Amino acid sequence: MPVTDAATEPAYTVGDYLLDRLAELGVSEIFGVPGDYNLEFLDHIVAHPRLRWVGNANELNAGYAADGYGRLRGMSALVTTFGVGELSAANAVAGSYAEQVPVVHIVGGPSKDAQGTRRALHHSLGDGDFEHFFRVSREITCAQANLMPATARREIDRVLSEVREQKRPGYILLSTDVARFPTEPPEAALPRYTGGTSPRALAMFTEAAAALIGEHRITVLADLLVHRLQAIKELEALLAADVVPHATLMWGKSLLDESSPNFLGIYAGSASAPAVRTAIEEAPVLVTAGVVFTDMVSGFFSQRIDPARTIDVGQYQSSVAGEVFAPLEMGEALQALAAILTRRGVSSPPVASPPAEPLPPPPPREQPLTQKMVWDRVCTALTPGNVVLADQGTSFYGMADHRLPQGVTFIGQPLWGSIGYTLPAALGAAVAHPDRRTVLLIGDGAAQLTVQELGTFAREGLSPVIVVVNNDGYTVERAIHGETAPYNDIVGWKWTEVPNSLGVTDHLAFRVQTYGELDDALTAAARHQDRMVLVEVVLPRLEIPRLLVELVRPTSPDGSPRR
């Protein structure tokens, strides 16, 4: 067995520099799959005092896990090998780009010398061009670097700074020889982006906003960019400056305390509950904070927002009645609005709430399950601190209408909408915050795509609650088109046996068809906080939630086609 002479090994390498920077940014776990071009780099991850390797069943799942981790931690990292590995993860990375999640994708590549020969190396396309996949990365990441020894430190800092600032993925191609190249540790912390607000723009925005607000009550519609840009405290200060009715889009669900008497609900254009739609669309002054209207969260762009009565607060610019003020950062714009409300000294009346209706009694225990029954009961099972991930199907739209307890975080993927995303993302979320119990809500078709990570949950000692909605195929697609078409069918699995086959030994598994069986299963899940609990919920093929019924209608209320 060959013996490595430690004296010939560099004390500190480019790979170490990259890892130290990631640790500095709050990363403590790195997801991925080993491959021969990244193995030596993985040795450095394993040896790093502040980092831990979390291996995944495949690269796509690793990318999804990094996304879930990044949503909670504000930064994450993914390691794959050249070509075959990175392309397998590309779908996940593209989703992180679409949904503005900061993920650093590190790709172990062939040595520079090997690339220089232009030979047909494994994992390449065989044409001697080793930048095909680097060029692909330009379309789905905000910054890219093909590291060279002389400039590696500077390029690492550039990519990581862009990822942190833009809240989107970055790409680093780390060749085997560059990874082991000697260098020096960072001398100082990674420089932060310093101020993007013009004092003149802020003053003009404040003047225009104050004039529009006057003595009016404002209403706030908030969305996920407030979370991504870490402006939640500024938004909460605005809501505390007066009695401010507020709502979110589905994308921003759980951004605000949904138990507040001033919380209106979820706004989804024409698919909204009537009271929510009226409150938002007829507000005397509407403040939209970090709002991005996508087809699936706006009722296919059926929102009716009057620009003349709207103050729109964005990442780098804000507008008042259509007049744009820039450069102006979101946090400072929200602070200015809070100051306007505080200075005017007018207290708005309480938000009118409909009279409280007595809670209906639970359904009979023997009653077959419906979508509403399932999500009503799941919602009552949630406790502060839970992280809920709902896959893009009946799970997402079933939960969107329900108010969550304070302190619950809700994660979905309504823009990218890659089914199966939430199972590995739940793994990433659980690794990011093992002290918060993860609750995964996913359909049977979606779960079949990424179910391998159940074994990783077990290996990591995690205890999620997993609700698999077994409605015998792709129900959302059936509702849109092809109700009985064979392409919306899937092979049925014995879900309660799946955890065992994937190496999960200490778990509970239930198959439920009635309300009583569901109630018993969720009660058991609450008792066993230290064990994985899988609940297979059997529902009819065409049973879909109210909100999804509205969204899949072929036409808008005015008769125009939605698609």
Swiss-Prot record:
InterPro entries recorded: DHS-like_NAD/FAD-binding_dom, PDC/IPDC-like, THDP-binding, Thiamin_PyroP_enz_cen_dom, Thiamin_PyroP_enz_TPP-bd_dom, TPP-bd_CS, TPP_enzyme_TPP-bd, TPP_PDC_IPDC
Top EC category: lyase
EC number: 4.1.1.-
Region of interest (Disordered), ranges: 348-367
Keyword Lyase: yes
GO function term, MF aspect, one: magnesium ion binding
SUPFAM superfamilies: DHS-like NAD/FAD-binding domain, Thiamin diphosphate-binding fold (THDP-binding)
Annotated GO CC locations: cytosol
Keywords in alphabetical order: Decarboxylase, Lyase, Magnesium, Metal-binding, Thiamine pyrophosphate
Manner of cofactor binding, per the entry note: Binds 1 metal ion per subunit. Binds 1 thiamine pyrophosphate per subunit.
Binding annotation for Mg(2+): D444, N471, G473
Entry cofactors: a metal cation; thiamine diphosphate
Family matches, as PANTHER family: PYRUVATE DECARBOXYLASE (PTHR43452), PYRUVATE DECARBOXYLASE ISOZYME 1-RELATED (PTHR43452:SF30)
The protein's role, per its UniProt record: Decarboxylates branched-chain and aromatic alpha-keto acids to aldehydes.
Name this polypeptide is given: Alpha-keto-acid decarboxylase
Originating organism: Mycobacterium avium (strain 104)
Gene label: kdc
